[in-house]
């Protein structure tokens, strides 16, 4: 027997709540009011109290029924009805004074019952219009229906679940109670609600706690955005996984040679011209522990993957040649690694060369906050030679040490998730993708969603070219079975069946299309103040490029002095030279603005900036740069005058003429040149001259414009 409230029990026994409370007090059970909850044993005791009374009542009713005068037979009743149809008003008149007389109560009740019976018979006769046909027996009038027992309430559930909100009707259904009862409870709590009104979480919890029912809210997970889903594994399910290492550095400083020396294979000889052409992922075993290496072409692929939200690298090995020192791409690699917040191990390569000077390299790297441990810093430096394999063991030991310090762990006993390292279309096998498993275990036959495409893993090949049936965390494998070629940096996830994988992939493709059509989200000086005002911006990331090192230093120092409340200027990269595609790639990944001082973006950089909606600001006066950034941060930016490039020409030859000066013989490579055009003379990405054209001639004739032939 379940628990009941006092009023519910009273309703069940068809007695007032006060009567039940009185009975409980007689039983020495204290209750405060009709809302008090009765335990199952108390309900049972009350049942015993009420059973005898019920029996007596039934006996009394039976006695009363026997004492009543005999009802007339059906035939007599019909005759009686026929005779009295016309004397209805007289009978009514006779009945009135009967009430006034002080007759005894018992007789009065008998009379009223007889009168009610007569009325019923008269009404039945009137409906028929005539008395019953001769020879046919009239059915005896139905006996009074006994009062129906109280409706038994459903047992309360132990727990209910809901998603978002519930209406009063829905909550009542879940609790097995009438909506009116829920509305009454809400009213008692000071909440006015109708049957179709939505209830918030607090109201649902209050009602359920009053009934003693547990509440659980379901959280809807958008599986299409599985990159954002963070599955928290139990600590006992986590096991140690191999570290994922990326080797970065300047051209010809020995990145691939170093990896080749570690793997004991001839990767460099297979590459065209000894330069890495694609991203390769390899796994090596050191002291019974595995290390996964990603061999990237410079740092572009690293940044591309990071721009897509794929943080795959655990440790960055920065390769610097001992005879060459810190170069522009070395600085870029440092900035990329720092922006990704990845620990750096510096590998000073080529120490076997006579002109090698490792101490100079260490001194140069201190300018970029990479201080060696032996000099009191926290950066690990390894001196080695990839050619002679000197110092390799020390480097590998340091990788394992950093890995141990980082406590890299993953759960292999779940559906696999990870990142695409590279992808291509093979003529024989179709779309092929190199995947890096970051958690879970990938098996042959698993339904998989990769980026906006899907498929079923048909075959898996490891870095040695051998077929494998499953891949564990930090293991790179090449898979086939996808419907389309994904992009490098795309995330993948395994689902329960191919049908669901297809639905998720289609939804992701649709969402990507909508995002491409939507308004740009990249930060620009025009909408900077709006983003600051809305609290979206806490840091303003800038990439600074200038014509000379002195200008770079002066510009960086001036920009860092800008003080606007709530926003900090952060220089993520500053270098000498033209604005390149690599700068745009870094700006895309870091949501930064590119500032060019006396330099211009090359053609590829322009195209990339337009495609990725990166804001490039070009200036020739430092004061103007500072003023523009400060004004943008304070929301006082002047309207921008857009510069339209109508053509480009290449200087093929120069002629010096006295009294005139230098004449440039040009070949139009793009668009056209007009006589009233303003021109810039750019040499190796640096603006040498800016002004107007004095004269424009084709052969000896004065030409209004010069177009591409």
UniProtKB/Swiss-Prot annotation:
Family: Belongs to the TRAFAC class translation factor GTPase superfamily. Classic translation factor GTPase family. IF-2 subfamily.
Ranges of Basic residues composition bias in the record: 125-137
Identification of the protein by name: Translation initiation factor IF-2
Pfam families: EF-G_D2, GTP_EFTU, IF-2, IF2_N
GO molecular function: GTP binding; GTPase activity; translation initiation factor activity
Residue positions binding GTP: 249-256, 295-299, 349-352
Residue ranges, annotated region (G4): 349-352
Region of interest (Disordered), residue spans: 47-157
Composition bias type Low complexity, residue spans: 138-149
Region annotated G3, chain positions: 295-298
Cell compartments where the protein resides: Cytoplasm
HAMAP family, per database record: IF_2_B
Function field: One of the essential components for the initiation of protein synthesis. Protects formylmethionyl-tRNA from spontaneous hydrolysis and promotes its binding to the 30S ribosomal subunits. Also involved in the hydrolysis of GTP during the formation of the 70S ribosomal complex.
Start and end residues of each tr-type G domain: 240-409
InterPro entries, per database record: EF-G-like_DII, IF2_II, IF2_N, P-loop_NTPase, Small_GTP-bd, T_Tr_GTP-bd_dom, TF_IF2_bacterial-like, TIF_IF2
Chloroplast recorded as keyword: no
GO cellular component: cytosol
Alphabetical UniProt keywords: Cytoplasm, GTP-binding, Initiation factor, Nucleotide-binding, Protein biosynthesis
Region G2, residue ranges: 274-278
UniProt region (G5), positions on chain: 385-387
Signal peptide per UniProt: none
Region (G1): 249-256
Composition bias type Basic and acidic residues, residue spans: 47-70, 105-121
Organism: Geobacillus kaustophilus (strain HTA426)
Primary localization: cytoplasm
């Amino acid at each position: 027997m379940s628990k009941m409230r006092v009023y519910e029990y009273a309703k069940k026994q068809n007695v007032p709540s006060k009567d039940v409370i009185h009975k409980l007090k007689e039983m020495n059970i204290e209750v405060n009011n009709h809302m008090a909850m009765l335990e199952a044993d108390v309900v049972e005791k009350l049942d015993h109290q009420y059973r005898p009374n019920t029996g007596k009542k039934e006996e009394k009713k039976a006695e009363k029924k026997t004492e009543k005068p005999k009802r007339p037979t059906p035939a007599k009743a019909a005759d009686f009805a026929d005779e009295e149809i016309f004397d209805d008003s007289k009978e009514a008149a006779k009945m009135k004074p009967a009430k006034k007389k002080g007759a005894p109560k018992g007789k009065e009740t008998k009379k009223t019952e007889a009168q009610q019976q007569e009325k019923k018979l008269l009404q039945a006769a009137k409906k028929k219009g005539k008395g019953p046909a001769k020879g046919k027996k009239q059915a005896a009038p139905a006996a009074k229906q006994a009062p129906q027992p109280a409706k038994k309430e459903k047992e309360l559930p132990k727990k209910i679940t809901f998603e978002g909100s519930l209406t009063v009707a829905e909550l009542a259904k879940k609790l097995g109670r009438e909506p009116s009862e829920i509305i009454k409870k809400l009213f008692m709590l000071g909440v006015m609600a109708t049957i179709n009104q939505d209830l918030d979480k607090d109201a649902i919890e209050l009602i359920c706690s009053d009934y003693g029912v547990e509440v659980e809210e379901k959280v809807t997970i958008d599986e299409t955005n599985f990159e954002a889903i963070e599955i928290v594994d139990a600590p006992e399910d986590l096991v140690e996984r191999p570290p994922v290492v990326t080797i970065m550095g300047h051209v010809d400083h020995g990145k691939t040679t170093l990896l080749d020396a570690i793997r004991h294979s001839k990767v460099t000889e297979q590459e065209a011209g000894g330069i890495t052409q694609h991203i390769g992922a390899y796994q090596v075993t050191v002291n019974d522990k595995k290390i996964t290496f990603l061999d990237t072409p410079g740092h572009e692929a690293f940044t591309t993957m990071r721009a897509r939200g794929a943080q795959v690298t655990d440790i960055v090995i920065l390769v610097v040649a001992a005879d060459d020192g810190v170069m522009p791409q070395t600085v870029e690699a440092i900035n990329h690694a720092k922006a990704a917040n990845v620990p750096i191990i510096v590998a000073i390569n080529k120490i076997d060369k006579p002109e090698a000077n490792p101490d100079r390299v260490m001194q140069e790297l201190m300018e970029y906050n990479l201080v060696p441990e032996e000099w009191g810093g926290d950066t690990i430096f390894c001196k080695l030679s990839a050619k002679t394999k000197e110092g390799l063991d020390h480097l590998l030991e340091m990788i394992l040490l950093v890995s141990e310090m980082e406590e890299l762990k993953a759960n292999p006993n779940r559906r696999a998730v990870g990142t695409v390292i590279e992808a291509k279309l093979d003529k024989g096998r179709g779309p092929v993708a190199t995947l890096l498993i970051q958690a879970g275990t990938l098996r042959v036959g698993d339904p998989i969603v990769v980026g906006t495409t899907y498929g079923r893993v048909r075959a898996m090949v490891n870095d040695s070219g051998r077929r494998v049936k499953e891949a564990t965390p930090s293991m790179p494998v090449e898979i086939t079975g996808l419907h389309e070629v994904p992009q490098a940096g795309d995330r993948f996830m395994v689902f329960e069946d191919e049908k669901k994988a297809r639905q998720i992939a289609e939804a992701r493709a649709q969402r990507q299309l909508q995002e491409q059509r939507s308004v740009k989200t990249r930060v620009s000086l025009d909408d900077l103040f709006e983003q600051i005002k809305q609290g979206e911006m806490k840091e303003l990331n800038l990439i600074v490029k200038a014509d000379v090192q002195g200008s770079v230093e002066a510009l960086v120092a001036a920009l860092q002095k800008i003080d606007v409340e709530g926003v900090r200027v952060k220089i993520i990269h500053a270098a000498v030279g033209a604005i390149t595609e690599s700068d745009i790639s870094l700006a895309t990944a870091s949501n930064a603005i590119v500032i060019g001082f006396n330099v211009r973006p090359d053609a590829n950089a322009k195209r990339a900036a337009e495609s990725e909606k990166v804001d490039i600001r070009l200036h020739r006066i430092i004061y103007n740069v500072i003023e523009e950034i400060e004004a943008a941060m304070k929301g006082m930016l002047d309207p921008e005058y857009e510069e339209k490039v109508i053509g480009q020409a290449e200087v093929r030859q120069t002629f010096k003429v006295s009294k005139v000066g230098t004449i440039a013989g040009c070949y139009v490579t793009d668009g056209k040149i007009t006589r009233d055009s303003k021109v810039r003379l750019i040499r190796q990405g640096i603006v040498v001259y800016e002004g107007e054209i004095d004269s424009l001639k084709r052969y000896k004739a004065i030409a209004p414009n010069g177009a591409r032939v």
